[in-house]
Curated annotation (Swiss-Prot):
It comes from Mus musculus (Mouse). SUPFAM superfamilies: PLC-like phosphodiesterases. The keyword Glycoprotein does not apply. A divalent metal cation binds at E72, D74, H87. It is found in: Cytoplasm; Membrane; Cytoplasm, Perinuclear region; Endoplasmic reticulum. This is Lysophospholipase D GDPD1.
Amino acid sequence: MSSTAAFCLLSTLGGYLVTSFLLLKYPALLHQRKKQRFLSRHISHRGGAGENLENTMAAFQHAVTIGTDMLELDCHITKDEQVVVSHDANLKRSTGVNVNVSDLKYCELPPYLCKLDVPFQRACKCEGKDTRIPLLKEVFEAFPETPINIDIKVNNNVLIKKVSELVKQYKREHLTVWGNANSEIVDKCYKENSDIPILFSLQRVLLILGLFFTGLLPFVPIREQFFEIPMPSIILKLKEPHTISKGHKFLIWLSDTLLMRKALFDHLTARGIQVYVWVLNEEYEYKRAFDLGATGVMTDYPTKLKDFLNNFSA
């Protein structure tokens, strides 16, 4: 390679790196900042599954009463095409009955068990008296001013259409987020109703990471408005230490190192994209997420997070 060619190559690379860094810090130079219809720091996972039975009206009411900024919930569709709030497609874990939501009419759904495991807290259970599986429209009616984050749990066109219709019926486009880790579901949601903001699918999260570490992210337009990701390190507390191999521990460490990046969070935030980290249940986890620049935290313990935020200065 001649010295002239080498100089041109280095100049081009240098220009690219400088431009990438500049746009990473100041994305408004290239992209119009997305309008934020609401801002959520305190997000109650399944309504707060550590303080009330998950995805119940009692859980949602408790979370709203203490001042949560957002309810996170999961949706399935019944045999008679009713949109219900339930995390699992099969109800064995939550009700003790080995049956699929889609195989029963709404009136046939069994009640939740009176005691359920807290999903992201090892060896912890939550008890409650409200064991009824609610309809999504009940949640919309009860909390008309509360932002709601909807996980569309199955790739079902009728479910997606019904949820969209309910959002429009209750005029909640400005207070709703929807999607799933599955990119096909997210694409269908966006196609069905582009007025409802969508979250990043797993495939898109991985793409964003690839673009970030190659310096290309500042140049790429983004349609999603909510970057919702786990904190990989919490996996270590959910399992018995002796059950985690060294290889698994390394993968957890690597995932955490790649995903928990303040520069990434700050860039997305500057573009009007909210960053939510899930599902965190300890104060040191809350602090780490907010110190990294997360917009909000999803928790099973809304009271604990509320107390933390009352004393936390970002």
